[in-house]
Amino acid sequence: MRLAVIGGDGIGPEVVAEGLRVLRAVHPKVETTDYDLGARRWHETGETLPDSVLAELRGHDAILLGAVGDPGVPSGVLERGLLLRLRFELDHHVNLRPVRLYPGVTSPLAGDPAIDMIVVREGTEGPYAGAGGTLRRGTPQEVATEESLNTRFGVERVVRDAFARASRRPRAHLTLVHKTNVLTKAGDLWARTVAEVGAEFPAVSVDYQHVDAASMFFVTDPARFDVVVTDNMFGDILTDIGAAITGGIGLAASGNLDPSGANPSMFEPVHGSAPDIAGQGLADPTATVASVAMLLDHLGHADEAARVEGAVAASLAARAAAGGARRSTREIGDDLATRAAG
């Protein structure tokens, strides 16, 4: 496996180091290349993602990212210049976010709800495509536009991915989330595409929720969801709700995928760089390790992925049974690597 590693800023390098230890515990043949990208590089050079680095990244099987950013970088610089550019250039059109409540993890929701869903979020279109502009900026007549771009090609490929994932799960249920009653043009495209592709997956049951209703049901009845497919912005919001109800953003893993394999997919914890605790051994690497499980699964190493996922579940349950005593980044990494190694 040829793996590009972007430790990034703050706690990013710390959690990535533990993720790599767990990866090597189950898959020793890993060749890594480290890339200095993020806030530190921007402060020193003004660069976010040089073309030469992007070209090198394309030569890897996958990318493991820690976290990027610090308060000194203006909003949007790293988001658009690095993270979104990687998504667009590497065609990461599927953003995959598991939403699972592990045994022993406390949810803020009452009643110990059963939560086990996957959100399949479109990753290269919608309002994040960068279309729009500003007129008469800084004047009382200022106009700002952000256009949501939805193509049949882009919608269909993410919908197909979602149906395929639903067909492999026991419940085989897919929910389209949109706002078809107001966003009638884009909503119609999404709804028709789901209906047409769904005809090819007769074993998958399908329903629809407006995004506002889905937001409520994520909190009041999350067990109703199995696989959710939605556009870029709605998915961005819903998945953070999903993280909040399953133990917090610190346990949330994600994958930015080109399922075709033409480009390396990227895997990362959802949390930020947390510069206030960097270097203190306080960061929990569990989300990074869960992202490593997704990486292995994506590259076809299902058995190794299951071992890492099992290690995450067992470690979280053991920590809960021990009363949730604080452990260092390294200690958690030790535990996860030992469990994964079997």
From Swiss-Prot:
Q: Which Gene3D superfamilies match?
A: Isopropylmalate Dehydrogenase (3.40.718.10)
Cofactor(s) the protein requires to work:
Mg(2+); Mn(2+)
Which amino acids does the record list as binding Mg(2+)?
Answer: D212, D236, D240
Cofactor annotation remark: Binds 1 Mg(2+) or Mn(2+) ion per subunit.
Q: In which pathway does it act?
A: Amino-acid biosynthesis; L-leucine biosynthesis; L-leucine from 3-methyl-2-oxobutanoate: step 3/4
- What is one cellular component GO term in this UniProt entry? cytoplasm
Which reactions appear under catalytic activity for this entry? Answer: (2R,3S)-3-isopropylmalate + NAD(+) = 4-methyl-2-oxopentanoate + CO2 + NADH
Instruction: Extract the Pfam families matched here.
Output: Iso_dh (PF00180)
- Protein's job: Catalyzes the oxidation of 3-carboxy-2-hydroxy-4-methylpentanoate (3-isopropylmalate) to 3-carboxy-4-methyl-2-oxopentanoate. The product decarboxylates to 4-methyl-2 oxopentanoate.
Tell me what this protein is called: 3-isopropylmalate dehydrogenase
Species for this entry: Parafrankia sp. (strain EAN1pec)
Please state the gene responsible for encoding this protein. Answer: leuB
